[in-house]
Amino acid sequence: MSTTDIYNYLKISERLVTGGQPTADQLRDAAAEGFTAVINLYPSNPPHSLDGEGELVESLGMAYVHIPVDWSNPTDADFAAFESAMNRLAGEKVLIHCAANFRVTAFYGLYARKHLGWPDEQAEAFRAQIWAGSDYPIWEAFIARHSA
């Protein structure tokens, strides 16, 4: 098993991957593969989240950032917290996840557009590997607001 087995796994670079909710074993694999940080955008919601995830991640020697983004109400504050975490962890090997890599692909696409110079088309194509924003009007509006 490895991090590549995480649900909806996407590799952005050697230092950055995204995915859905990892199992405890997949988090152990992440530590063994040299990841130094985990950003979790999924609210604590057992059984869909991993109970004690933060403690496990930290016990494995990785930094843990939890930004619980409500699927039905993503906020500007959520995105600002994500931007701050990404900027703080620049240069680290980071696993970013939520439940199914929906929140993450939206947030990372917006982040990469704003901070890494990705054109709109690249950010859209990145997210579209996992889901279509038009399927979720709240998210479509959130993405449009941050793309303006």
Task: Label each region the model flagged.
Residues 26, 106-107:
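Phosphate- and divalent-cation-binding pockets in alpha/beta enzyme and binding domains
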Residues 1-20, 62:
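Mobile, glycine- and charge-enriched loop segments
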Residues 20-21, 102, 110:
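Gly/Ser/Thr-rich helix-start
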Residues 16, 93-94:
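Structural motif
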Residues 94-105:
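A phosphate-binding catalytic loop at a beta-strand-loop-alpha-helix junction
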Residues 3-4, 11, 30, 55, ...:
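N-proximal short alpha-helices
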Residues 78, 83-93, 110-148:
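PTP/DSP superfamily signal
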Residues 17-88:
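Cysteine-based protein phosphatase catalytic domain of the PTP/DSP
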